[in-house]
Amino acid sequence: MGSSSYGDGEGYSVYGQRFDVDGEQAGDAFQINTETYNNQQDPSIASLQDGGFVVTWESRYQDDLDANGNGNSNYGIYGQRYDANGTPSGSEFRVNTYTSGEQTHPAVASMDDGGFVIAWQDSSGHDGGSSYDIRCQRYGSNGETRGDEFMVNSYVSNDHHDPDITGLDGGKFIVTWGDETTHANRPGTDTSGWGVFGQVFT
């Protein structure tokens, strides 16, 4: 899976290639993003409990496309589910609720209940956030949202970048990210500047 600048004639697009258990190609490479305006890039993929998979990526100008197909916002986060045969399950969907600022650098992980969770870097400033925060959205096994999107980082001073996410046993998951916060009262603060922080969710 990766981004290509040659597929749809508009800019970067996200493509995938399935492989069998022996590492042999299963079918041809295929385009994942439905919307092709401007750039779709920086994909992340996770296998699901039912044998399918989900892909997420950042898409430029798609959040607020007007009637003429012209975008007015910057990057947003999108996703597409597939079944075990590599057939799309439903339509491409937007992940981020808030469209101001930029939503970039998505990461996705599967959950042991059949669902999945997506994290991303966000500059909307929602919930009193800083220049860049980390936000998340959970999904059920049928691709339905579970609750609202939420901010991951507790401290909002300075910047929080480049999330990664992993599903854990018992319906838990952990999000990690690069963090510039040097608050004196913050446990584990890396006073040298950037540090790596994490948060477990249940």
Language-model segments: which ranges?
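Extracellular, repeat-based ectodomains that mediate carbohydrate processing or recognition
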Residues: 1-202
